[in-house]
């Protein structure tokens, strides 16, 4: 097992009560691993208790990236939330802690 951060980096954005996280493979060869193991269901489970709505995954193969749009993730949004991280920027780092299976050695 390894952490997602070993093969990818991430960026976070927000709009209202919705957060989106892009997960970008460092190398194109790791994109199939992202596709297979970083599913909407796994992301939703990883953020249990944080994300109240659905998690939708968008695939960006030309960028070797995935984008997850998570509804109900920001406690009502920046203007309504009392959270220290109202924009949800720390969610990207938290997602990179997701455990995935090691890439097979060629």
Describe each region flagged by the PLM.
Residues 1-106:
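Long, contiguous binding/interaction regions
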């Amino acid at each position: 097992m390894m952490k997602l951060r070993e093969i990818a980096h991430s960026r976070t954005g927000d709009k209202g009560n919705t957060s989106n996280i892009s997960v970008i493979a460092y190398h194109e060869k790791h994109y199939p691993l992202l596709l297979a193991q970083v599913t909407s269901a796994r992301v939703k489970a990883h953020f249990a208790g944080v994300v109240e709505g659905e998690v939708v995954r968008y695939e960006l193969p030309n960028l070797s990236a995935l984008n997850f749009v998570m509804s109900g993730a920001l406690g009502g949004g920046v203007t309504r939330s009392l959270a220290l991280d109202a924009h949800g920027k720390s969610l990207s780092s938290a997602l990179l802690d997701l455990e995935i299976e090691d890439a097979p050695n060629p």
